[in-house]
Regions:
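Macromolecular interaction modules
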Residues: 1-213
Length: 213
């Protein structure tokens, strides 16, 4: 995150009060082997209607930067965990030197498992590429991750932002891409927006609440 390559990310999704989560849960995960840093986040657009989630919605997100020694713990009641490893391709975007204070979290899977690599190639060489080229204000690095052990959601696109209004930045992204590739009724836009065997599992915006030292 920010100015470093993170081998893996472990996410926890919860409706628990964020102060309680930060006090009781964050230290327990940080104490595990392979965990380097933690941040915790507030969902700023819960129950969004434009991209309704397949995964259960949640209020707060814990993000743990982990290395290859990490093994995901059993999540306590009221918490759902997802362990992702950095995909072998690089992230795209810019490093501004400012802290990551906003996120756009995108979780996707292939409808047909046999097309997983085709979906991954589309995401890297078409979808994320055009977003990075659009230079969306507030957007920094966009990094691909793959779920450890397979299953759903298969891939994570982790959009880091240096703006404290991540939802506004997210909503500005598609119009800026349209300026580059064409309107929503063009083949170019459809190719960008609708990947092969794409199943959108979750999309939302998050604002940072706190971080470990």
């Amino acid at each position: 995150m920010e100015d470093r390559i993170t081998p893996g990310l472990y996410l926890e999704m919860t409706d628990r009060a964020i102060d309680e989560y930060a006090r009781d849960r964050v230290p327990a995960v940080l104490a595990r082997p392979g965990v380097q840093r933690a941040t915790w986040w507030r969902n700023v657009k819960r129950d969004r209607a434009d991209l309704p989630p397949v995964l259960p919605e949640f209020d707060h997100l814990g993000v743990y930067e982990v290395d290859d020694a990490f093994r995901a713990p059993e999540a306590p009641p009221g918490v759902t965990g997802h362990h992702f490893r950095h995909y072998r391709r690089p992230g795209q975007g810019i490093v501004t030197g400012r802290p990551t204070v906003g996120l756009s979290l995108v979780l996707i899977s292939p409808k047909d498992e046999s097309r997983a690599q085709e979906l991954r190639d589309w995401a890297d060489f078409v979808h994320i590429r055009h977003i990075a080229e659009a230079a969306v204000p507030g957007y920094c690095m966009i990094t691909p991750y793959e779920r450890v052990g397979g299953g759903d959601p298969r891939f994570m696109h982790f959009y880091e932002m240096d703006t404290d209004d991540p939802e506004r930045a997210f909503k500005s992204m598609t119009p800026l891409v349209i300026e580059r590739i064409g309107a929503t009724d063009t083949p170019e836009f459809r190719h960008w927006a609708f990947g092969p065997s794409l199943r959108i599992m979750y999309v939302n915006s998050f604002a940072r609440v706190g971080a470990s030292s």
